[in-house]
Amino acid sequence: IGITENGDYRSCGFHEGYRIGNVKDKKLRTAWEELQKSPLHLKLRDKSNIKGRCGVCEYSEICGGCRTRAEYYTGDLFESDPACNYIPKVLREDPKYLERMREELYKK
């Protein structure tokens, strides 16, 4: 949970949307409990909703990528984090994926 300069609670301190109240109207504990029960937060916590590389990554349960960055750059909160350069093991072992990456890397 993040608290902005004007006292708004947000699900992430970097995300402009998803306001869940303000310190003037709501205690932090109440905001936290409401966030834990919100449909969006429950969907975000279910790692099976995460797409792309982050969705198949062996570290998804402890990382999952930055959802705010994913939404900012891709328009989709559940897409892979574009700033992560890690290639999950399942993709490193996929010859088709490796060939696509080679083609992208060396295209002229």
Residue map of PLM features:
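Iron-sulfur (Fe-S) cluster-binding modules
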Residues: 93-108
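Sparse recognition of residues in long alpha-helices and their boundaries
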Residues: 22-23, 73, 100
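Short, acidic, Ser/Thr-enriched surface-loop or helix-capping motifs
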Residues: 3-4
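C-terminal accessory region of radical SAM enzymes
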Residues: 8-10, 14-64
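Phenylalanine-focused residue identity feature
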Residues: 9, 14, 78, 105-106
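Short C-terminal domain-edge/linker segments immediately following a structured domain
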Residues: 31-34, 41-43, 85-89, 96-99
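Cysteine-cluster motifs in flexible loop/terminal segments that predominantly coordinate metals
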Residues: 48-97
